[in-house]
């Protein structure tokens, strides 16, 4: 055993305890157990005072009452995490707690839970559709999140008419959009969006071409400067 251990105060915090005072650890632990065992049900942390919680929440749990041996092994585990015996004891204690919770929750009906999602997580019972719909209404779509509509498939004849008109002028008025739409079978809004996208595409291609030309000019100027420098040296 190491030269120092840890003890637990009433607040649940760990503080160091010297090896000379190890005999007082069990006395403090027993006092803690008695304090939790005799705690009245009307305490702020007790759920038995709330009528919304079923009887299974009020049943005694091996995880709520502190065990002196368990507290001792927790102290040893916090001080020496490589001890296989201490780790095995802690894992067995966790399995015991899980088995108790599973047994208590399996005996309850879905209507006895204070909240639908508690029953869903405890007994793997799907929540009612009304609850899911209510949860969806509490988180509406943000104004910035715009839903994108489906792309309109254009036929070859429609694209030919649109491109021919765009080559004449990249803008089109409302009256002309209506007339053209009646001929090729498109709405004025669809024609407007197509012209906007076409103008944006051309501007993007033009900017890309200008950037490529600038890079090419810089490269050509650098090559010419290097050639001139070679001629001067020679």
Swiss-Prot record:
Residues 147-206 bind DNA. It holds the Pfam family Homeodomain. PROSITE patterns: HOMEOBOX_2. Disruption phenotype: RNAi-mediated knockdown on an hlh-1 mutant background causes embryos to become paralyzed and arrested at the 2-fold stage. Residues 220-234 have a biased composition (Basic and acidic residues). GO terms for molecular function: DNA-binding transcription factor activity, RNA polymerase II-specific; RNA polymerase II cis-regulatory region sequence-specific DNA binding. GO terms for cellular component: nucleus. InterPro entries: Distal-less_Homeobox_TF, HD, Homeodomain-like_sf. Keywords: Developmental protein, DNA-binding, Homeobox, Nucleus. This is Homeobox protein ceh-51. It comes from Caenorhabditis elegans.
């Amino acid at each position: 055993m190491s030269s120092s251990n840890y003890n637990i105060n009433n607040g649940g915090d760990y503080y160091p305890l010297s090896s000379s005072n190890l005999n007082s650890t069990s006395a403090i632990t027993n006092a803690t157990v008695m304090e939790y065992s005799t705690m009245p049900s009307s305490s702020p942390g007790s759920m038995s005072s709330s009528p919304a919680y079923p009887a299974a929440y009020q049943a005694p749990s091996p995880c709520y009452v502190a065990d002196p041996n368990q507290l001792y092994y927790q102290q040893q585990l916090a001080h020496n995490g490589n001890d296989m015996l201490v780790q095995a004891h802690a894992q067995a204690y966790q399995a015991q707690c899980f088995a108790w919770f599973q047994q208590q929750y399996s005996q309850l009906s879905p209507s006895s839970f204070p909240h639908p999602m508690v029953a869903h997580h405890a007994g793997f019972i799907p929540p009612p559709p009304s609850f899911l719909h209510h949860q969806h209404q509490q988180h509406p779509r943000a104004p910035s999140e715009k839903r994108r509509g489906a792309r309109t498939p254009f036929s070859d004849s429609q694209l030919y008419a649109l491109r021919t008109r765009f080559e004449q002028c990249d803008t089109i008025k409302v009256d002309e959009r209506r007339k053209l739409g009646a001929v090729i079978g498109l709405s004025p809004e669809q024609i407007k969006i197509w012209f906007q996208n076409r103008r944006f595409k051309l501007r993007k291609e033009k900017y890309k071409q200008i950037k490529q030309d600038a890079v090419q000019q810089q490269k050509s100027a650098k090559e010419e400067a290097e050639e001139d420098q070679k001629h001067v040296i020679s």
